[in-house]
């Protein structure tokens, strides 16, 4: 059963078409409203959705997981028209809750995939590319790959909450950074943990 609130709008109890797309992207509701038919791009062998003027007015590129590209492509027709109109959105649907669930799922996915040393190096390379191109505040301060061999350990209330909910409290730091940079457009691990991975 869904953790998300059902909408009072008839036919929009599941969040409508925006929620169908968002299960593959984990965007904020405001970002979904700005998407256009030409917001999908391909760069360095990967697929991204452009979020123009996202939170804080930032330009963002949200990575589409390789396994989800075919489904995401169905929503984009290459035109400059907006993907959704106001009536497509569920009035009481928790799109941000959907974003939290997506963050947990994508972090778990990377944790599993990053057990392969080759995948791990390629993932770090992609993080570095996006970091140096889009992180205006800390472009020159990405840690070396060896830094990410150290796990990110939840502490205090965050650890207690994770244990209570049966979720991991020792995280793969590279998987966490990939989730943060490539999928949430955050640049700090602690923000991602506090806002998405250790919250309900």
Where are these regions (language model features)?
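Internal alpha-helical scaffold/solenoid segments in large eukaryotic proteins
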Residues: 6-15, 29, 70, 80-85, ...
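Conserved tyrosine-mediated DNA breakage-rejoining catalytic core shared by Y-recombinases
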Residues: 34-71
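Active-site/catalytic core of tyrosine-dependent DNA strand-transfer enzymes
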Residues: 58, 63-158
